[in-house]
Regions:
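C-terminal effector-binding regulatory domain of bacterial HTH transcription factors
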Residues: 50, 170-179, 189-239
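Immediate post-signal peptide segment of exported/extracytoplasmic ligand-binding proteins
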Residues: 17-24, 113-116
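Central regulatory/effector-binding core of bacterial HTH transcription factors
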Residues: 21-81, 230-235, 239
Length: 239
């Protein structure tokens, strides 16, 4: 958990590429920043060495008419008004937990086995686990064990520490899954019906740096694998 808090602290600091004349200020959610953007920053630096990015971590909406922020990545339905909105990708969730939890004394063979484990909830999205369980054909009854945390970032970190099972964005956790830090006990993916979007001030003429970041993040999103084949990840098939 301390590692996750350290990551958030780092994420709130300014991140810059090589100094250049074109500066772009960007606001993104901490989870998106630490799990998706930061691991890919070197590719942006290599492709656009003359663009400087100043990135801050925030989940709030930006008033681009008053803020110095040039661009932001929002998570939602894409129905914000008076800003330019560009779709990046849909968000799907899968259950994730630590490898140790999978090999413990309470095996996870089928979704109903989750009743014997702690479910980790994001406090503002308590509906997610009941919806996933309904999709899996399991009634949300008998789940007395639970842990509520304030963000997806902390929920995923808690799962990695073996504190329970969390629902996580399948793309944002792909590195931890590939590295064996997290495992997917069941391969049932739930469509959140929400997406990531790149947004900025309406009718704004993009600078070279803003256009560069826009082109790059859209390309990277297209190249991002949602999740590896379940056989490679060693997950249980949902049945």
């Amino acid at each position: 958990m301390k590692h996750a808090l350290d990551e958030i602290e780092v994420a709130t600091q300014r991140i810059t590429t090589n100094a250049g004349n074109d500066v772009v200020t960007i606001s993104v959610a901490p989870n998106f920043l630490t799990r998706w953007l930061m691991p890919r920053m070197s590719r942006f630096q290599d492709k656009y060495p003359d663009v400087e990015l100043q990135i801050s971590a925030s989940t709030g909406l930006i008033d681009f008419n008053k803020s110095a922020t040039d661009m932001a990545v929002y998570f939602g339905h894409g129905d914000w008004h008076d800003i330019e909105v560009h779709f990046l990708r849909n968000v799907f969730q899968v259950p994730v937990c630590s490898p140790g939890l999978m090999s413990g004394s309470r095996p996870l063979i089928q979704p109903a086995d989750l009743r014997r484990h702690t479910l980790i909830h994001v406090s503002k999205r308590l509906y997610e686990w009941p919806e996933w369980l309904q999709l899996a054909g399991v009634e949300y009854t008998g789940f007395s064990r639970g842990l509520q945390l304030s963000s997806s970032q902390l929920a995923t970190a808690a799962a990695q520490e073996g504190l329970g099972i969390a629902l996580a964005d399948s793309t944002l956790t792909s590195r931890e899954i590939e590295q064996g830090k997290l495992v997917v006990p069941f391969d049932l993916m739930m469509d959140t019906h929400k997406s990531f979007y790149l947004v900025y001030q309406k009718n704004r003429l993009l600078t070279y740096g803003m256009q560069a970041f826009k082109d790059w993040v859209i390309e990277e999103m297209l190249d991002s694998s949602v999740i590896k084949e379940t056989s490679e990840l060693g997950v249980n098939k949902h049945g």
